[in-house]
């Protein structure tokens, strides 16, 4: 707490810092945490291979290539005609399969560590700074509104939670910035979203009865007297 108090951040610094953190938070939510973790994993594989950090992945790739080559060779011979050779290849394939599985488990553990690291970094970038701002700088006035710009009741709302009328604190500023950034992202991405089909209004279809059928049903039955006699 002494370190934070010693900083004594200027209101302008708080405005810019909170805006930056909220922008990063909105971008992370827009892109998706899982997508960022996947990009970080691919970056780790690309850079880690050159720096010797992702040895498990490199070894896994080589072992898989050897296993595919061995399986092709095993399928190319007959187990009955060349039983000894086929048995030897089969033992090698089983050994390589076990090694590939072990390396796959190591890669899964490495990926889990990368995902956890990305989660911690995102936490420090997007969540902890906001809590620090709310706890230690909640009583800081960021700026003052010119007199008469807004009605009195609007100034009182903007002064929430406990500032004088005409003041704007961190709570209202962060709420406004969050909504503005969210609206801007929506407007920028809305044209690229898939179009929604126009709903078709369902109309009641009445059954049309032919006129001949109507006349037959409505006309009385005529009995031929001559035929009856």
Swiss-Prot record:
Keyword vocabulary terms for this entry: Coiled coil, Endoplasmic reticulum, ER-Golgi transport, Golgi apparatus, Membrane, Transmembrane, Transmembrane helix, Transport
Transmembrane segments: 15-34, 123-143, 168-184
Positions in coiled-coil regions: 60-117
Residue numbers on the Cytoplasmic membrane side: 35-122, 185-229
A Gene Ontology molecular function term of the record: protein-membrane adaptor activity
Membrane topology, Lumenal segments: 1-14, 144-167
Entry GO terms, CC: endoplasmic reticulum membrane; GET complex; Golgi membrane
Sequence similarity: Belongs to the WRB/GET1 family.
Name of this chain's protein: Golgi to ER traffic protein 1
Source organism per UniProt: Scheffersomyces stipitis (strain ATCC 58785 / CBS 6054 / NBRC 10063 / NRRL Y-11545)
